[in-house]
Amino acid sequence: EITSGNVDVMEKTASFIVHPPVGKWLIAAGEQLFGMNSFGWRFASLIFGVLLIMVTIRLVRRVSKSTLIGGLAGILLTFDGLEFVMSRTALLDIFMAFFLVMAVACLVADREWFRNRLASYLERREIADLGGRFGPALVLRPWRIASGISFGLALGTKWNALFALAAFALLSLAWDIGARRLAGAGSRTKLAILRDGIPAFLSLVVLSLVVYAGTWASWFATSGGYDRQWGAE
């Protein structure tokens, strides 16, 4: 009925919220631009499907150090059946996939950023390694913060992203520990569990949960959302 122009089937009252709102906002943005029709509700999925391919190319290129391999990854994803279908369907999975891959791409960029800062630290002091010292405390790391925001948006699309957040937060800390060990921190490497672990927890886990909570701003700011008055009732 919707494709024939009858949108009266849409309910005026709020219904059960199965998933968080970010992906639904994006679908609604396409409908706002192009109307409640098959193109309007697919538009955002198409855009994010294309962006997913671009981010994948950049991620694989950064990991492999090869433009060719990055390009091949993009080609393979372009012709992947699931990517093809999800980019043309008004479902949430393509949005969550994009935000998750973006989060991982930012973490990989942070890994490179962190190692470059360690190398610069050694170069400025004209030393070969840390010599058993812990090294610089790099707390504000822009790429890691960007990753936390991306994870938060992924959580704001579907809760499934929580598993990826937990896994990659631990992996990011492991990368830091490995980098300090390679730089010669020696026995002080274990201090990274707290001195790098706490900033990582704040930048990834806490920030992503703050972003996730922020995605519900419209629910908190209005009174007509599903179960909005459950406490009073």
Give the positions of each predicted feature.
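Membrane-integral, polyisoprenol-dependent glycosyltransferases
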Residues: E1-G225
